[in-house]
């Protein structure tokens, strides 16, 4: 599950410094109160083409939360927008492999050197939040190598932290089964209210008009993403809250001729909402450090009454979008760039089937 490209400063940094981790990402299972700590280890590799005098070798792991928001001034004398910004470091860990300030600078012959490191990341840490221009929660490894002669070397490698929520409470079928205004009975159901980013939401519809000659014009469904941000400025000013709502994906369905017959007592059909595969188009549900993202499925039903008037039925179903560790999300999508979606996916890129739609696992049978 790749993240943004590696970054560094100094001559031929990519050929000199590297960080190899024992896992591609940190995975927390459950809420911040339930998740167990995760052990992460790795190796910092340094390749020198010539003898070099080293002043220090350090490795940092930092977690940073950034939030920014624009607001329109409500005072007549003050026009224009004001930008609120907040940034704070909530996690920091440093490894000093060599410190020239405490020891004499070290002359290192040409060759390849490896420095192992490890860390235990507590399950209460917030998950990475990417894909939003106005907010982010990110983790970053930074290598600093000071040289007596020549430019110092720095190298960055991001670390993604994923939290998979408890899927059991929302993993069963959910349906709204009601009679609306004594005009129409309906049943709208989804198989699972917990959905992995990049998969789909299947919606089943059943409508039974209670009035003669009442017809359904169209059904529109939208996945709405709601972002609530709390900004505490770095300059100590007053806090600021902001909310934005975005339509992630939508579907509009007009009933065809097969449903126009008056003899039909009910309308039954199914529709699908395909979720984006890029974090720049959809963000997983989260509520950490003043960054809250939630989703709901909004359904709008337009109906023609026998007297010629129109009626509208509006419904909303809360859903939880999570980032699956088994599904590929597009790298660099956190920058808000438009990432073209592929026409086809390789089998290795596909998400595991939704709950209730999987096949029984087959036992391994060795061949004779």
Swiss-Prot record:
A biological process from GO: ubiquitin-dependent endocytosis
GO molecular function, one term: protein-macromolecule adaptor activity
Domain of life: Eukaryota
A GO CC annotation given for this chain: cytoplasm
UniProtKB keywords: Ubl conjugation pathway
Role description: May be involved in signaling by recognizing appropriately phosphorylated substrates via its arrestin domains and then recruit a HECT-type ubiquitin ligase such as hulA, leading to ubiquitination of the substrate, providing a link between ubiquitination and phosphorylation in protein regulation and stability.
Similarity comment text for this entry: Belongs to the arrestin family.
Assembly notes: Interacts with hulA.
Protein name: HECT-type ubiquitin ligase-interacting protein apyA
Organism listed in the record: Emericella nidulans (strain FGSC A4 / ATCC 38163 / CBS 112.46 / NRRL 194 / M139)
């Amino acid at each position: 599950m790749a993240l943004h490209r590696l970054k560094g400063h100094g001559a031929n940094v990519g050929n000199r410094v590297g960080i190899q981790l024992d896992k591609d990402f940190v995975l927390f299972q459950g809420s911040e109160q339930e998740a167990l700590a995760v052990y992460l280890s790795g190796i910092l590799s340094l390749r020198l083409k010539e003898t070099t005098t080293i002043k220090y070798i350090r490795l940092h792991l930092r977690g940073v939360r950034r939030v920014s928001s624009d607001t329109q001034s409500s005072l007549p004398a003050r026009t224009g927008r004001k930008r609120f910004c907040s940034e704070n470091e909530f996690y920091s860990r440093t490894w000093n492999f060599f410190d020239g300030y405490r020891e004499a600078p070290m002359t290192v012959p040409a060759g390849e050197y490896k420095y192992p490191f490890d860390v235990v990341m507590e399950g209460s840490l917030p998950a990475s939040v990417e894909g939003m221009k106005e907010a982010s929660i990110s983790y970053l490894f930074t290598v600093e190598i000071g040289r007596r002669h020549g430019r110092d070397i720095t190298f960055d490698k991001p670390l993604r932290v994923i939290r998979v929520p408890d899927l059991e409470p929302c993993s069963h079928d959910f349906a709204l089964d009601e009679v609306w205004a004594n005009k129409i009975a309906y049943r709208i159901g989804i198989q699972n209210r917990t959905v992995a980013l990049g998969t789909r939401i299947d919606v089943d519809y059943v409508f039974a008009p209670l009035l003669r000659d009442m017809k359904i014009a169209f059904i529109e469904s939208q996945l709405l993403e709601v972002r609530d941000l709390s900004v505490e400025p770095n300059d100590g000013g007053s806090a600021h809250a902001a909310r934005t709502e975005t339509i992630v994906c939508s579907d509009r369905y007009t009933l065809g001729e097969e449903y126009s017959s008056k003899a039909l007592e009910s309308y039954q059909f199914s529709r699908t909402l395909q979720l984006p595969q890029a974090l720049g188009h959809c963000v997983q549900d989260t509520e950490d450090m003043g960054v809250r993202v939630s989703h709901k499925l909004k359904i709008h039903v337009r109906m023609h009454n026998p007297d010629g008037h129109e009626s509208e039925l509006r419904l909303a179903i809360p859903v939880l979008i999570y980032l699956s560790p088994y599904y590929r999300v597009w790298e660099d999508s956190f920058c808000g760039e438009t990432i073209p979606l592929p026409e086809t996916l390789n089998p290795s890129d596909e998400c595991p089937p939704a709950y209730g739609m999987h096949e029984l696992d087959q036992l391994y049978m060795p061949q004779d």
